Design a protein with these regions (language model features):
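N-terminal secretory signal peptides
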Residues: 1-30, 37
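Extracytoplasmic "Venus flytrap"
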Residues: 45-66, 70, 79-90, 110-111, ...
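An alpha-beta-alpha
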Residues: 67, 156-206, 297-318
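Structural motif
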Residues: 78-97, 210-226
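Periplasmic-binding protein-like
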Residues: 102-111, 131-133, 228-238, 256-257
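Flexible loop/hinge segments that line or gate small-molecule binding clefts
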Residues: 123-150, 259-267
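Short beta-strand elements at the ligand-binding edges of bilobed clamshell
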Residues: 139-165, 175-180, 266-279
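Segments of small-molecule ligand-sensing domains
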Residues: 290-381
Length: 381
């Protein structure tokens, strides 16, 4: 069971906090969806901040696409700002949206926006909600008008791993990642276990670039992995553009991340793990407009509509598609458990014993600090 803290939003009153056990995104949103038409309620002004450009073919673009989907709703005013660094600049940008645009809710989408920036600004504006994309919210110590939302993107990454496992001829996959934080490690491990469910001899070689956006090092890492025999590349960086283009240029397969990158690699693109923020943002807006209670902590995967897979590339075989579709269907029903023991890390240590399993909602998974068996790489040094 996950734990959520709910509060009721009213632009003319302070937020009221209620602690309660949360059943998950679907229950929290009460079945609302992107096609939902708002009933009688107040207009909503929402502000979005991105650490990079809106069209980066990656993380920032995924949020921009979610924001752009709101344009069809006349009762929502959405403002945004791109290329906002994780400095005091984000504080100024948030205050500008509140004071000049009248924003009632702010979505600071970058990991580094949370501490100290959101935590410093939120107490100054108790009638404004600050909803951070990530897993940093803690009800025991953070302001009442702060919350977080995130998707179980590793479900879609797992599906990509199945496809990669079917399509690899060398049995060597490559993963270019930014830094070894729990969410990144969870994606790497899910991808690896999925690929090895197809072929237990597969290995996944990981390179950490040390930063979310380092195109030079990303290109160097991609070429190095390909030179070592890797024939499928994927990544967890802010913009996968360089990795996808390098893989295509070198004639190998690729799996995307954040948004659909098939246009970057028309021959070698297999599939990808995508965010689906449009539903989240519309559902938040609807709840704010109606003054209904909003969970401080939101999580969801395929079943809740927060993540999706990119369409298959032309090269993907019927067998790979069928296997991936089958597992995705199990995720949709809530029947598939990725982290089911026995599982060993890549040093041979048992990290999850036989008979023990962790549901996606288990907080233990959000503190992951190990790499699974089959990964070539280290979390430190």
């Amino acid at each position: 069971m996950s734990y959520s803290v709910n509060f009721k939003f009213n632009p003319k009153r302070r937020l009221v906090l209620q602690a309660m056990a949360g059943a998950g995104l679907g229950a929290a949103f009460g079945g609302l969806g992107i096609g939902h038409v708002q009933a009688a309620g107040k207009k909503v002004t929402m502000g979005f901040l991105y650490v990079g450009p809106r069209d980066d073919y990656g993380y920032n673009q995924s949020h921009f696409e979610g924001k752009s989907a709101l344009a069809k709703q006349s009762w929502i005013k959405a403002v945004d700002q791109e290329n906002v660094p994780e400095t005091i600049a984000v504080q100024k940008a948030m205050e500008s949206m509140i004071n000049l645009d009248g924003a009632q809710v702010i979505f600071p989408t970058s990991f580094g926006y949370f501490d100290p920036h959101i935590l410093k600004i939120a107490p100054k504006y108790p009638d404004v909600m600050f909803l951070h994309c990530g897993g940093l919210y803690d009800a025991s110590k953070h302001p009442k008008n702060v919350g977080s939302y995130f998707g179980y993107i590793d479900e879609a990454v797992y599906v990509s791993g199945i496809v990669a496992g079917h399509m690899s001829k060398t049995g060597k996959l490559g993963y270019i990642a930014a830094i070894p934080i729990p969410q990144v490690l969870r994606n790497i491990n899910s991808f690896t276990m999925a690929a090895r469910s197809v072929n237990p001899k597969i290995t996944v070689q990981v390179v950490f670039t040390g930063g979310w956006s380092n195109p030079v090092k990303e290109a160097e890492s991609a070429n190095s992995l390909i030179d070592q025999g890797v024939d499928v590349l994927t990544c967890h960086v802010d913009s996968p553009k360089v990795v996808m283009e390098t893989a295509e240029k070198r004639g190998i397969y690729s799996c995307g991340y954040h948004v659909d990158q098939s246009r970057l690699a028309p021959k070698g693109f297999l599939t990808g793990a995508e965010w689906s923020w449009s539903k989240v943002y519309l559902d938040y807006a609807t709840m704010i407009s109606k003054g209904t209670k909003i969970p401080n902590l939101i999580r969801g995967g395929f079943k809740e509509g927060l993540v999706k897979s990119s369409p298959y590339g032309k090269a993907v075989t019927a067998k790979a598609r069928a296997h991936a579709d089958e597992v995705r269907a199990q995720f949709m029903k809530g029947d598939f458990v990725v982290y089911q023991g026995p599982i060993k890390d890549n040093t041979g240590k048992e990290v999850i014993p036989k008979g023990k399993g962790y549901a996606q909602t288990d907080i233990w998974l959000e503190s992951m600090d190990w790499l699974v068996e089959g990964v070539v790489g280290r979390t430190k040094g």
